[in-house]
A protein has these predicted regions:
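Terminal-region recognition feature
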Residues: 1-103, 109, 114-116, 120-131, ...
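Small cofactor-carrier domains centered on a conserved lysine used for covalent cofactor attachment
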Residues: 143
Length: 238
């Protein structure tokens, strides 16, 4: 990310916890959204509107949508207005799906509605020691009688290894930015253009008998599909 004069900020005078603009990530122009700041990133009506405009801008300009999020959810003191704003944003994110790449990076606690947005992303990166869930450990305990920690309920390790919500985890934000840049290098800006081409010395007609060897011979057997993919992708890079 440039973080400097090259960034084009949009709706920068509206204030609140959401800021966005057109920026660069490893040389690729993207619509970059930041959800953080005051009141633990709680979303007010204007914040929901900013999220909606950011998603609409990405779709109209055919640019990838990259969101860094840490939010406690809709601002309680704003009532139904905040919930409506979040719903408007969610609708715009749905409209982006399948049109432009959507990548989320969880940089801090992400609770309630914003946690649901992760399910609309094509890829989710979580920084270590962050968590994301709709309802917290106390409420879950009241309903189930089970005790949970933030990490056990919705931590980065849980979402990467068990729920599948997180596709990648990183130790810090810089590492996450580098990873997002790599992911973008494999993807087109939008659905109407071809993805970037990478040179490869891996022959297209290379036999992959090892992939077949991984398939169990019994109907009750199991295998890790990632091992199969590693056999067939170019240069074994997965």
């Amino acid at each position: 990310m440039t973080g400097g004069t090259d960034r084009v900020g949009l709706r920068s005078l509206t204030g609140g916890t959401v800021s966005f603009g057109v920026d660069e990530v490893h040389g690729r122009h993207v619509v970059l959204v930041e959800i953080s700041g005051e009141d633990r990133g709680s979303l007010r009506p204007a914040d929901g509107e900013n999220l909606a405009v950011a998603a609409r801008t990405a779709r109209d300009q055919r640019l990838p949508l990259v969101c860094f999020v840490a939010s406690s959810g809709a601002a309680v003191d704003e009532g139904v207005g905040a919930v409506h704003g979040w719903g408007t944003a969610a609708r715009e994110f749905v409209a982006c799906s399948g049109v432009v790449p959507i990548i989320f990076c969880v940089t801090g606690p992400t609770v309630s509605g914003p946690a649901l947005l992760l399910g609309l992303a094509d890829m989710v990166v979580m920084i270590d020691d962050t968590f994301a869930f709709v309802s917290g450990p106390r409420m879950v305990s009241q309903f189930t009688g089970e005790e949970f920690s933030n990490e056990g309920l919705g931590g980065s390790t849980m979402h990467e290894r068990t729920t599948g919500v997180a596709h990648f985890t990183c130790t810090d934000r810089d590492g996450a930015v580098d990873l997002i840049g790599e992911l973008l290098s494999y993807l087109p800006d939008h659905t109407d253009t071809a993805p970037p081409c990478w040179p490869s010395g891996d022959p297209v007609d290379r036999p992959t008998p090892e992939a077949g060897d991984l398939i169990p011979t019994t109907t009750t057997g199991s295998y890790d599909v990632r091992d199969v993919l590693s056999c067939v992708v170019d240069d074994g890079h997965l």
